[in-house]
Amino acid sequence: MAKHTVKVGVAGRFGPRYGVTVRKEWSKYYVQKKAYYVCPKCKQKKVRRIANGIWECRHCSYKFAGGSYNPEYSAEIVREVAGNV
């Protein structure tokens, strides 16, 4: 039996479906979404995503808005939003 997770990590659960490029891209965002991040308030590495764009620290219960897959916004998004205001 072939190993599905050598190239694509957690996306190996899809087996041979969807192609390796799509599975690699999905895997990159999925790992970002599920990772722990540093809390901006208490500096503990306990921040997890609760919903799309909503992040919560499991240590101090601090909730804040952030990106969809990452609590920090990228510089490109900040420039784009600032340009539209």
UniProtKB/Swiss-Prot annotation:
Family: Belongs to the eukaryotic ribosomal protein eL43 family. Putative zinc-binding subfamily.
Zinc finger region(s), C4-type: 39-60
Cofactor(s) of this protein: Zn(2+)
Subunit structure: Part of the 50S ribosomal subunit.
Any one GO biological process: translation
Full protein name: Large ribosomal subunit protein eL43
Cofactor binding comment, as recorded: Binds 1 zinc ion per subunit.
Cited function: Binds to the 23S rRNA.
Keyword Lyase: no
Binding-site residues for Zn(2+), renumbered to this chain: C39, C42, C57, C60
UniProt keyword terms in alphabetical order: Metal-binding, Ribonucleoprotein, Ribosomal protein, RNA-binding, rRNA-binding, Zinc, Zinc-finger
Primary gene name: rpl37ae
GO cellular component: ribonucleoprotein complex; ribosome
UniProt GO molecular function: large ribosomal subunit rRNA binding; structural constituent of ribosome; zinc ion binding
Disulfide linkage: none
